[in-house]
């Protein structure tokens, strides 16, 4: 203590004789980041924080984009637990993965998306790399476009689109444009507006498409509408960039959910594709995803793969191991794959059932509004058509939390609270 005290005295004497030293130290301590402003809170995380502070026993969080069981609890798929047990029993090492990820995972992901009998797979004219979930796949794809897509910097997003699409592409150096997608009057797909806008997009531009379970609206084109969109894309020579975060989770059928992607490829449109296993395997925190580029031939695919690895290396060197092992085990083990497909269908069916129950309960409440769009929409999210002031009332009067645009996560609705939700919605809309 004596030494510490004497040290302080000496430093104080030094500062007295050399006041510039104290001023310099003070400047160094406070001047580097004074210009940095407080960033805005994430709108969805903000909903969750407000929900946590609420003490109402009937409170509902319909903002979170994660599946919940019918008790409102996080759900780990039994097939995932089995895969984890099998992996643990093998006593595997924890060595780095290659830059492109776990080979057996990448192969299985491409097969899941494109179909096991895909001509693209048989000819080898594709490359798939493992990514840090769907967000990582989008960023890798966006960075590849920024570096090698020499025709345009414009990426056309549906209006609306997932909130993270804009910063991902913007931060990669691309420019964002939009095309009509959602019709607020019908709470459905604005097919006429979408086709009209896409047909006017400058040739050799990038068009982002949600493969299934459009986020945030839950509104998807029908197969015949997808066909017409593909025709326009081919005619305008647009590059189709697919985001497929919900394969299997939308309809309960993985092949049905991948129909649009496969149709585009069958029409001779070489696409790129982002996949995520957060929703359909419940591997949210494992960050498991894939990015696939369909190429002209196998030689082009090899060159694209080499450049994707060059992009990945300075970003994160190589992807995480554990989640990819789990996904690969499920996709490549017949009994686990069969079980997983049944579980995915079970999750999708529960969400479809909650949509039906919500509409039924709204009718029981005496609501005269047309709520058919709730059952017409698909996937985890539903655009209710509620106005911001109605959303505010739901929060203040009923402790029901959602984003201001009226989007709800149907996964947060259970057989135990759907009646309360219907009552609250009726009260703010009657």
Curated annotation (Swiss-Prot):
Positions carrying Phosphotyrosine: 96
Modified residues (Asymmetric dimethylarginine): 313
Annotated GO MF terms: kynurenine-oxoglutarate transaminase activity; L-aspartate:2-oxoglutarate aminotransferase activity; pyridoxal phosphate binding
Keywords: Acetylation, Aminotransferase, Cell membrane, Lipid transport, Membrane, Methylation, Mitochondrion, Nitration, Phosphoprotein, Pyridoxal phosphate, Transferase, Transit peptide, Transport
EC number of the protein: 2.6.1.1, 2.6.1.7
Main localisation: mitochondrion
The reaction(s) this protein catalyses: L-aspartate + 2-oxoglutarate = oxaloacetate + L-glutamate; L-kynurenine + 2-oxoglutarate = kynurenate + L-glutamate + H2O
Phosphoserine PTM positions: 143
Phosphoprotein listed as a keyword: yes
Modified residues (N6-(pyridoxal phosphate)lysine): 279
GO BP terms, alphabetized: 2-oxoglutarate metabolic process; aspartate catabolic process; aspartate metabolic process; biosynthetic process; glutamate metabolic process; lipid transport
Modified residues (N6-acetyllysine): 59, 73, 82, 90, 107, 122, 159, 185, 234, 279, 296, 302, 309, 338, 345, 363-364, 387, 396, 404
Location in the cell: Mitochondrion matrix; Cell membrane
Endpoints of the signal sequence: none
Binding annotation for substrate: 65, 162, 215, 407
Transit peptide interval: 1-29
Gene Ontology CC terms, in alphabetical order: mitochondrial matrix; mitochondrion; plasma membrane
Gene3D superfamilies in UniProt: Aspartate Aminotransferase, domain 1 (3.90.1150.10), Type I PLP-dependent aspartate aminotransferase-like (Major domain) (3.40.640.10)
InterPro entries named among the record's database cross-references: Aminotransferase_I/II_large (IPR004839), Asp_trans (IPR000796), NHTrfase_class1_PyrdxlP-BS (IPR004838), PyrdxlP-dep_Trfase (IPR015424), PyrdxlP-dep_Trfase_major (IPR015421), PyrdxlP-dep_Trfase_small (IPR015422)
Residues found modified as N6-succinyllysine: 73, 90, 107, 122, 159, 185, 227, 296, 309, 338, 363, 396, 404
Residue positions, PTM Phosphothreonine: 48, 333
Domain of life, per lineage: Eukaryota
Function according to Swiss-Prot or TrEMBL: Catalyzes the irreversible transamination of the L-tryptophan metabolite L-kynurenine to form kynurenic acid (KA). As a member of the malate-aspartate shuttle, it has a key role in the intracellular NAD(H) redox balance. Is important for metabolite exchange between mitochondria and cytosol, and for amino acid metabolism. Facilitates cellular uptake of long-chain free fatty acids.
Other observations noted: In eukaryotes there are cytoplasmic, mitochondrial and chloroplastic isozymes.
Family note: Belongs to the class-I pyridoxal-phosphate-dependent aminotransferase family.
Protein name as it appears in the record: Aspartate aminotransferase, mitochondrial
The gene coding this protein: GOT2
């Amino acid at each position: 203590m004596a030494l510490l005290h004497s040290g302080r005295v000496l430093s104080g004497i030094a500062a007295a004789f050399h006041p510039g030293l104290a001023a310099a130290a003070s400047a160094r301590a406070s001047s580097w980041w004074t210009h940095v402003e407080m960033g805005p809170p994430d709108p969805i995380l903000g909903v969750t924080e407000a929900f946590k502070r609420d003490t109402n026993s009937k409170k509902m969080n319909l903002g979170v984009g994660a599946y919940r069981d019918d008790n409102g609890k996080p759900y780990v798929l039994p097939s995932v637990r089995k895969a984890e047990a099998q992996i643990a029993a093998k006593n595997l090492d924890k060595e780095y993965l290659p830059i492109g990820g776990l080979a057996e995972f990448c192969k299985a992901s491409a097969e899941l998306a494109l179909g096991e009998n895909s001509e693209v797979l048989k000819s080898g004219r594709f490359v798939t790399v493992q990514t840090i979930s769907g967000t990582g796949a989008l960023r890798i794809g966006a960075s590849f476009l920024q570096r090698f897509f020499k025709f345009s910097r414009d990426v056309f997003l549906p209006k609306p689109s997932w909130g993270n699409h804009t910063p991902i592409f913007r931060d990669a150096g691309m420019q964002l444009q939009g095309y009509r997608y959602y019709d607020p009057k019908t709470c459905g797909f604005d097919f006429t507006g979408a086709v009209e806008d896409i047909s006017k997009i400058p040739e050799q531009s990038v068009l982002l498409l949600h493969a299934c379970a459009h986020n945030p609206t839950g509104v998807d084109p029908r197969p015949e509408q997808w066909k017409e969109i593909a025709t326009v894309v081919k005619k305008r020579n647009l590059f189709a960039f697919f985001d497929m975060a919900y394969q299997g989770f939308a309809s309960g059928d993985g092949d049905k959910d991948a129909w649009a992607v496969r149709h585009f490829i069958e029409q001779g449109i070489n696409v790129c594709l982002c996949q995520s296993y957060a929703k359909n395997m419940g591997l949210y925190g494992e960050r498991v995803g894939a990015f696939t580029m369909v190429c002209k031939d196998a030689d082009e695919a090899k060159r694209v793969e080499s450049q994707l690895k060059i992009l990945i290396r300075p970003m994160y060197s190589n992807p995480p191991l554990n989640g990819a092992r789990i996904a690969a085990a499920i996709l490549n083990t017949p009994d686990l794959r069969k079980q997983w497909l049944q579980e995915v269908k079970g999750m999708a069916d529960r969400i479809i059932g909650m949509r039906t129950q919500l509409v039924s309960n709204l009718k029981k409440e005496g609501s005269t509004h047309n709520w058919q769009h709730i059952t017409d929409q698909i996937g985890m999210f539903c655009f209710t058509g509620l106005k911001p002031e109605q959303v505010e009332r739901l929060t203040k009067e009923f402790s029901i939390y959602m984003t201001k645009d009226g989007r709800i996560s149907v996964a947060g609705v259970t057989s135990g609270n759907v009646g309360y939700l219907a009552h609250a919605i009726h009260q703010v809309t009657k």
